[in-house]
């Protein structure tokens, strides 16, 4: 039988992955409200019914996009804190990894920005998607080790620290276009981003280290 006459076999994993890739790109560019199911299936090159087969509806597909992107960062957070026995190195490394992740995953920055523009309505309905409880728990352990050994000063709140860690890294990527003009630094430049990372590490550690 010639190849042209052979039946085409459906590959569920490939079809699902194509839908996720297309949806991630479109939701990142236009937000949840700016994208239709028709546009997603056209970009993915699959039948429309596949969306409802794998994800039930547009909301289910969007939830899976967020879960897929956010879980990658959660894995990095968990691995970083678990592998860093030295508290100072743990804090330094999570900042390095945040900068790296945000630079490598612009869709994460865009999706989170869109969710904030929507007042987090979707996250309110699916709070487990963006829960930082595991990261807070792991960061608390790092801080406790630092305080017990006298490296960090007492009274550091892990929730506020996590917000600071994320914020310092996030703004270099989320606001790079506007800040590049307003402060006169090219935030697209790898050299400038390295300077920003070094500055963020120094700033955080100077605030955590116990003064002698």
Where are these regions (language model features)?
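Amphipathic alpha-helical linker/stalk segments
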Residues: 2, 65-94, 123-124, 130, ...
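Short coil/turn segments at alpha/beta junctions that flank glycine-rich nucleotide-binding fingerprints
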Residues: 29-33, 84, 105, 149
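Amphipathic alpha-helical segments used for helix-helix packing
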Residues: 104-125, 176-183
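Short hydrophobic clusters on alpha-helical segments that form packing/core surfaces
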Residues: 19-27, 98, 204
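Helix-turn-helix
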Residues: 18, 26-60, 64-65
């Amino acid at each position: 039988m010639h190849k042209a006459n052979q039946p085409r076999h459906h590959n569920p994993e490939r079809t699902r992955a194509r839908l996720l890739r297309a949806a991630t790109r479109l939701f990142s560019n236009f937000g949840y409200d700016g994208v239709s199911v028709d546009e997603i299936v056209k970009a993915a090159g699959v039948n429309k019914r596949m969306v409802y087969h794998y994800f039930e509806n547009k909301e289910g597909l969007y939830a899976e996009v967020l879960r897929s992107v956010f879980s990658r960062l959660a894995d990095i957070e968990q691995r970083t804190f678990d592998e860093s026995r030295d508290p100072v190195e743990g804090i330094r490394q999570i900042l390095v990894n945040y900068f790296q992740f945000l630079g490598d995953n612009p869709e994460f920055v865009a999706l989170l920005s869109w969710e904030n523009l929507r007042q987090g309505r979707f996250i309110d309905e699916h709070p487990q998607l963006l829960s930082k409880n595991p990261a807070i728990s792991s960061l608390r352990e790092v801080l406790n080790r630092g305080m017990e050994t006298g490296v960090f000063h007492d009274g550091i709140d892990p929730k506020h620290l996590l917000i600071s860690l994320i914020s310092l890294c996030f703004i270099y990527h989320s606001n790079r276009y506007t800040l590049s003009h307003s402060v006169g630094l090219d935030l697209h430049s790898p050299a400038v981003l390295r300077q920003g990372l070094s500055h963020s590490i120094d700033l955080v550690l100077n605030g955590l280290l116990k003064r002698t």
